[in-house]
């Protein structure tokens, strides 16, 4: 895609990589924002939690589940950095004021339900509800983190969507995730339910095998989610729509069916 990002030090990995087909043959783009496995030194130095504890917040191995996408003519965008370090399926400035000892700029969204649940762009809590950082964060460092990881990822994704739409007249973005097998009262997931609810209070539901999220019909054409539902159900999987996950930032930000860009979030139950 011509989007190689250079950093001040070679020790820092690129924020993403793209697995591309020899030639893109379908108007599909796959993205895996929560499967990154790089836990930077600055994160590990600032937390009392182990890498194993932090990794429970991730959608581990989801990028591998979709690794065959290029063989079928579609590109796959894979995040490199751990979700506990930075959540790419959030607005860029969903930051928790309690994590800072300085006043945050006006453009920061510190009042979303995701932030309230400890699961903003820079998560405050790990999957088990433990606090990630022992001390306050510096806003300048967080801004640099966003510039280094968040914005390059989304610039790349936006370019992939644009290129696909130009080539095929449309683009279907599949945002790939995994989910715990059952809901609980800890804020372990935190993606959108009912347009932004953190998912707390769902109770201990037994979830389906697959949850498809289209923001209640606003992010993709109904024919697309209907087709996905029929196809997956036909494989013997138990499929739910928009419950408990209707789709996060990526789904509602990129999904513009009226312009030919459709976004669908897929959650795969980890018990599978």
Predicted regions and their residues:
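N-terminal catalytic or cofactor-binding beta/alpha core of small enzyme domains
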Residues: 2-173, 178-272
